Amino acid sequence: MECHRAGAEVFTGDATCRKKSVELLEELGLPKGLLPLEDIQEFGYNRDSGFIWLVQGKKVEHTFKKIMQKVSYDTKVTAFIENGKLRKITGIKTNAMMLWISINEVFVPEALPEKVTFKSSNGLSRTFDAAAFALGE
C-alpha cells in the first residue's frame, strides 16, 4: 500500500471518505453500495496505478438483504479499480455454507450491466443482480 501512496488522492473522515468512495464506484460503473463500510478513517486512490484503499475503525459484517448474502469487510480493504472492475481485492470475504471465502475480484460484465459477478481466489464465482448492491441495501 505504501508504494501507491505517492501521487495518490488521500481523504480522511467518515463523511468525506464515504462520499469520495461512492463517487468513484459510480464513475467506474460499479454499484454504489458495494462497499458499505463504517467509520471510514481513510480513503486513498492512486489514479495512475488504479490502487484504492479504505481503512475503517473496526471489521464490519454486512448482509445484503435482497440476496441474503453476508459479507465481511476487514479494517483495511484494498483493490485495483478500473472501469467496471475491482481486482486483487484484499479484506473482503463472503459467507458460503458456514465458510468464509475471500473475494478477489468483482466485476460488472459489459454485456450485462445489470449484473455483478464475484470471484474467489479458488476460482468460484457467483453473479447477482446489481440492484442488490444499491446504496443503502
Predicted regions and their residues:
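Extracellular/luminal recognition modules and glycoprotein regions
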Residues: M1-F51, V55-K65
